[in-house]
A protein has these predicted regions:
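Secondary-structure transition/capping residues
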Residues: 27, 36, 49-53, 110
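Short, charged/polar low-complexity linear motifs in solvent-exposed/disordered segments
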Residues: 33-35, 44-46, 81-83, 95-96
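Acyl-donor (CoA/ACP) binding surface of acyl/acetyltransferases
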Residues: 1-14, 19-21, 55-145
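Acidic-histidine catalytic/liganding microenvironments
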Residues: 22-23, 48
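Juxtamembrane/interface motifs at transmembrane-helix termini
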Residues: 35-39, 47-49, 84-85, 118
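Conserved GNAT-fold acetyl-CoA-binding loop/helix
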Residues: 24-43
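A short helix-loop-beta-strand connector motif used in the catalytic cores of GNAT acetyltransferases and
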Residues: 43-55, 64
């Protein structure tokens, strides 16, 4: 598994739309995106001077994106949204390890926010040593000190 995390590019719009328009992918996130909303997301979150999200690739193929940005003064929020064909194959776990390492190198603790019903994310967070800290804006918050 050779996963690359890189800055988003304008050319990611089609693959990002495929991801964000999929109702299965978006089940616990938001309503599926149309093309225009995907473009706004790409420009505001992925192409910003300080991005909130980054593309994830394996072997040069887009597999989804990761969330990596400041959560508060001491923490980075991490997460991932992957195409369904990459679910259950260890990609989220490997990406989580990479993002934890990046945050640790920056001297930060790590937070994952997710819908409480998102069993796979909750399972992965607990498996990686995150502790449930409560709810914020309808999302369960897990923290790795």
């Amino acid at each position: 598994m050779a996963i690359t995390i890189r800055r988003m590019q304008g050319g990611d719009a089609d693959e990002l739309y495929r991801l964000l328009s999929d109702p299965v992918v978006m089940r616990y996130l938001e309503l599926p995106y149309d093309r225009a909303r995907t473009e706004v997301f790409l420009h505001r979150a992925g192409l910003a001077a300080q991005p909130l999200v980054y593309a994830a690739e394996e072997g040069g193929s887009f597999i989804g994106y990761v969330i990596y940005h400041a959560y508060d003064g001491n923490s980075m929020e991490i997460g991932w949204v992957l195409l369904p064909e990459y679910w259950g194959r260890g990609y989220a776990s490997a990406l989580t390890d990479r993002l934890i390492c990046l945050a640790r190198q920056a001297g930060k603790s790590v937070v994952i926010e997710c819908a409480p019903e998102q069993a796979a994310t909750v399972h992965l967070a607990v498996k990686k040593g995150f502790r449930y800290c409560g709810m914020a804006d309808g999302l369960a918050v897990y923290r790795l000190a």
